[in-house]
Amino acid sequence: MRILLSNDDGYLAPGLAALYEALRPLAEILVMAPEQNCSGASNSLTLSRPLSVSRSAATGFYYVNGTPTDSVHVALTGMLDTKPDLVVSGINNGQNMGDDTLYSGTVAAATEGIMFGVPAIAFSLVHKEWAHLGDAARVAAEIVRHYLDHPLPGQPLLNVNIPNLPYEELKGWRVTRLGKRHPSQPVIRQTNPRGEPIYWIGAAGDALDASEGTDFHATASGYVSITPLQLDLTHTQMLAATRDWARAGSGAS
């Protein structure tokens, strides 16, 4: 078995090292991660300049001067002679639930695997800081082992959020849907030394839909949340209404 491991916090992140150690007994691991923290990079590819790949003398991890998506893209199309059995991303320093998944570099690294036909799992630790990182890595390894032993059909993309709790306090796994957040906080305006305005992106909004069945509800209740995602963004319930709308518009002229 071979696993491609990446993240969005960068190749020096504690979450990456912990996940690597937890997965080593399960498969051959190739690590390819961003050089810098790329939180919020989403599925961006670097097209304006060439990318370079380096290798850490300390860990053997490969890293690229680009995004999480770049990392997986380069590994799959430029380094590996055969497809890995699984792409794994994480462990992220902070949750990726609800709307977070659209911005998340952690989820994006996993998504890039799916783009090339490789099943993928993204792992995030709810709440920042690494208080129970070892416990989260243990859970992640259990989920990966279960997938390798009992693969899901097709090419699944799983988004996993692990409560920041001791292993013994976790209540188990729950399959969930994405919740929803309130809009993010307004940007924070400041002034640079030259008197020019600069802006910091505001904090993410609080949970809007944290009802039972959502990732927010599961993790708040002490469960590991597993949400199956898909690449098809088509709003199927809007197709009929949109056809009627387009038909009326094209006939109006």
UniProtKB/Swiss-Prot annotation:
<dbReference type="GO" id="GO:0008254">
    <property type="term" value="F:3'-nucleotidase activity"/>
</dbReference>
<dbReference type="GO" id="GO:0004309">
    <property type="term" value="F:exopolyphosphatase activity"/>
</dbReference>
<keyword id="KW-0479">Metal-binding</keyword>
<dbReference type="InterPro" id="IPR030048">
    <property type="entry name" value="SurE"/>
</dbReference>
<comment type="similarity">
    <text>Belongs to the SurE nucleotidase family.</text>
</comment>
<feature type="binding site">
    <location>
        <position position="8"/>
    </location>
    <ligand>
        <name>a divalent metal cation</name>
    </ligand>
</feature>
<keyword id="KW-0963">Cytoplasm</keyword>
<feature type="binding site">
    <location>
        <position position="92"/>
    </location>
    <ligand>
        <name>a divalent metal cation</name>
    </ligand>
</feature>
<dbReference type="GO" id="GO:0000166">
    <property type="term" value="F:nucleotide binding"/>
</dbReference>
<dbReference type="GO" id="GO:0046872">
    <property type="term" value="F:metal ion binding"/>
</dbReference>
<dbReference type="GO" id="GO:0008253">
    <property type="term" value="F:5'-nucleotidase activity"/>
</dbReference>
<protein>
    <recommendedName>
        <fullName>5'-nucleotidase SurE</fullName>
        <ecNumber>3.1.3.5</ecNumber>
    </recommendedName>
</protein>
<keyword id="KW-0378">Hydrolase</keyword>
<comment type="function">
    <text>Nucleotidase that shows phosphatase activity on nucleoside 5'-monophosphates.</text>
</comment>
<dbReference type="GO" id="GO:0005737">
    <property type="term" value="C:cytoplasm"/>
</dbReference>
<feature type="binding site">
    <location>
        <position position="9"/>
    </location>
    <ligand>
        <name>a divalent metal cation</name>
    </ligand>
</feature>
<feature type="binding site">
    <location>
        <position position="39"/>
    </location>
    <ligand>
        <name>a divalent metal cation</name>
    </ligand>
</feature>
<keyword id="KW-0547">Nucleotide-binding</keyword>
<dbReference type="Pfam" id="PF01975">
    <property type="entry name" value="SurE"/>
</dbReference>
<dbReference type="InterPro" id="IPR002828">
    <property type="entry name" value="SurE-like_Pase/nucleotidase"/>
</dbReference>
<dbReference type="InterPro" id="IPR036523">
    <property type="entry name" value="SurE-like_sf"/>
</dbReference>
